[in-house]
Every structure is written in C-alpha cells, then in structure tokens.
Curated annotation (Swiss-Prot):
One of its GO terms (biological process) is translational elongation. The modification N,N,N-trimethylglycine is found at residue 2. GO terms for cellular component: cytoplasm; endoplasmic reticulum membrane; eukaryotic translation elongation factor 1 complex; myelin sheath; nucleus; synapse. Mg(2+) binds at residue 17. The gene is Eef1a2. The modification Phosphothreonine is found at residue 239. Trimethylated at Lys-165 by EEF1AKMT3. Mono-, di-, and trimethylated at Lys-36 by EEF1AKMT4; trimethylated form is predominant. Methylation by EEF1AKMT4 contributes to the fine-tuning of translation rates for a subset of tRNAs. Trimethylated at the N-terminus and dimethylated at Lys-55 by METTL13. Residues 5-242 form the tr-type G domain. This is Elongation factor 1-alpha 2. Found in a wide range of tissues. It is found in: Endoplasmic reticulum membrane. The modification N6,N6-dimethyllysine is found at residues 36, 55, 165. Keywords: Acetylation, Elongation factor, Endoplasmic reticulum, GTP-binding, Hydrolase, Magnesium, Membrane, Metal-binding, Methylation, Nucleotide-binding, Phosphoprotein, Protein biosynthesis.
Amino acid sequence: MGKEKTHINIVVIGHVDSGKSTTTGHLIYKCGGIDKRTIEKFEKEAAEMGKGSFKYAWVLDKLKAERERGITIDISLWKFETTKYYITIIDAPGHRDFIKNMITGTSQADCAVLIVAAGVGEFEAGISKNGQTREHALLAYTLGVKQLIVGVNKMDSTEPAYSEKRYDEIVKEVSAYIKKIGYNPATVPFVPISGWHGDNMLEPSPNMPWFKGWKVERKEGNASGVSLLEALDTILPPTRPTDKPLRLPLQDVYKIGGIGTVPVGRVETGILRPGMVVTFAPVNITTEVKSVEMHHEALSEALPGDNVGFNVKNVSVKDIRRGNVCGDSKADPPQEAAQFTSQVIILNHPGQISAGYSPVIDCHTAHIACKFAELKEKIDRRSGKKLEDNPKSLKSGDAAIVEMVPGKPMCVESFSQYPPLGRFAVRDMRQTVAVGVIKNVEKKSGGAGKVTKSAQKAQKAGK
C-alpha cells in the first residue's frame, strides 16, 4: 500500500450546459470508485432508455438523483484517483443549494475546475452578463478558493472540429475575465478537452496535434502537462490549520446513556484533545473534554477536517446546541459577536435591500436572523474599490461593506483568521440572495460565564 495519498477537494463550476456532468462523470468513471458491476448496470439502463450517447452524464445523473432523494450514496462514487491524490468532488452546481453548500460547506474546496463549452454560440452564452460562468468563478474566488483549472470542453463540436483558433480565442477571453476577478492566469492550467469523447481527459488527444500542453508558473514551482488529469496533479495540497486556536462549530448535541452529553462537529482549526478545557460560545460555558471519538474509536487528538463526537462533563444537553462554537479556553476562546462588518455580494434579490433588512444568515452551522444595520459603502466587486459612501439601497450585482447585528446570540469570526467561520450565505425567499465574508467582529464583552466543576479542577491541576 505505501503511504496514503493526500486528499484533495474540488468543486466543478461552469454554465449549465458546459458539460460539467459529462466531464466529471468521465473522470469518476475512468479513475474512480464506481465498480464494474454498477457501470455495466448503468450502461445497460442508459442503452435501454436510448441514452447511450449520454452515459457519463447519466452516471452522474443517477448519483445526483439518489443524492437529491436523500439516499446518501456511497461517497466513494464522488471520488477518483490521480497518480498523486485522492480527489473528492464536493459539489457541482446545478444542485439547488450549490451556493449555500459552497459557503457553509462541510469542506472548503482546494481548487475549482471551471468548465467552459467551446461549441458555436455556447461559450458566448455561458460567459455573457447573465451567464453563470462569471458568477461561479467570482464566488469561488471570494470564498477563498484560490486555485483554478480551466477545461475548454466540447472541442469536438467547434467549427471545424478541434479548432485551434477557437481554443485560442476562448483562452484569451477567459484569461481576461478570471484576471478581473483576481486569479493570475499564469498559474491556471487551460486544457482543451472533450468530456464525452475523452480527448485530453486522461491522455493526450491525437485530434489536437497543435496543442503542445499547458504550463503554469508560480512561486511554489512551475508545472506542465497535457491532460486534465495531469493538471489535477498540480493542485497544491492544503495546509491544515493546526497551528491556529481551536474552532469547532457544533452540528448536533446528543445525550448518550451512561456517557452523558456528546456534542458532535467538525474541527475547522486547531486541535481538540481529551483533558482540554473548552469554552462554548455564545453561551459562554467552560468545561472539560473527557474523551474524543471518531467512527466509534477513541482519539488522542482530532485535527482540522475530522468529524468527531466528544464527551463533556457537567453540561446538560439543554445548555449547548447546533451553531454554538467550541474553542480552547486558554487560546483565543470563542466569544459572542455583538456585531460584525462584512463584505457582501448581492446575487439575486428581486427588489432593493436597505438598512434594516433582516434575512437569515447561514454561517458555519449557525442559522440566525441578522440585521443589515448600516450600509457603509458600495464597492466594486472585483477590485474592492469604494464607489459610494452610505448607499441608500443595494440591488442584485452590487457589492457592499455592511455592518450586521445578530438577532440572537451568535459566534462568528473574521474570514482572515478563521475562514470557515467567516463566510456566510444570506437566505431569503428560500434561496441564497447574497454571500458575504466577515472583515472584523466586535466581540461582546461577556461577564463571567459558567465554569463547571470539572473545568475548575482541571484548571487548578493545570496550574
């Protein structure tokens, strides 16, 4: 076996008809966790339904349908392997809650793969003012996905097929607009592919002898290659934020007979260890962690990315809840936010948003109404430059700096310090109307909170 490969998360973005499903389906199909039997079954069904020409997307559609019906599919189906990495596709748009998932998502994507269609008229539709391509790329960048790969898809349907001229034209245009967003095109591999026929997906295509390969230049080291698979191998693996103080947003709290109160959640930053004295915010309760476990096995430490349950002493299941944040009481313990300043981008709101607007904010696992108390300035969404002070209102497409006040006690952090606790989705009318990143947080100076007996003991012993 040797050493396990590093795990990488990618998000696949692009216009609705760019061929995202076919492309991802192809990778999963050829390098992935779908066993031969399932593939044969899918192929047979696809053929019977006259969808033979659609088999890769069909595989993905089947998986998506199962996912949407709430059947949790074997997640290995969304994984595939490259020579260096295990890659998980954490989400692909087209999914109703894609934007919300991308923000509150259980995991941050390490890289975005942008698929653009090269077919006649298709590229133009995707990149036009109201195309989704720009929106998705902007979102990815705003939410901290700083690595990008571009697949120029459907090269088989250009005029003439596999046209170098068309490819060059698209690369030029996409480079210009990802640059406006903030990506540096020199660090972005561009690959001409056909997700359907398989050109340049896993190996060099004989249909594009003119394509000499892609190159990236960056301080971490230059790279080059030909296929999309090779481009995925150039992704720089994430550094786990173990050196930051602990932040663990609670997903649930269970009461387990014979054990007691067991909060469950994912370590976002720092390390959780048994014996540690932790503080829960915004409730301001401090107690000792007795044990930590993952998949029913006791751990001596839990690291960022680990979903764990941990047993806490002298705390009732009524005291803490989903959306609370657990941290180390000795290292920058989490606190309730009195208010926070955010950079917000309005995505799709039918009317005008003015001061006083109070939608629900989804930030990490918290789901709380917050008031847009003050619209401080309207800014250019790409450069961040100020356009006007104290705008009267905001509409779709606008970006602004906004002062926000939670309607109920809530714990959030600045994006620069704790990224997963500093990005949020604004939900209204059953959709994501805006996204935001938190610039700074004014903490509520809490009085003395509740410190349990076991915490006092542990603190004394630790002195």
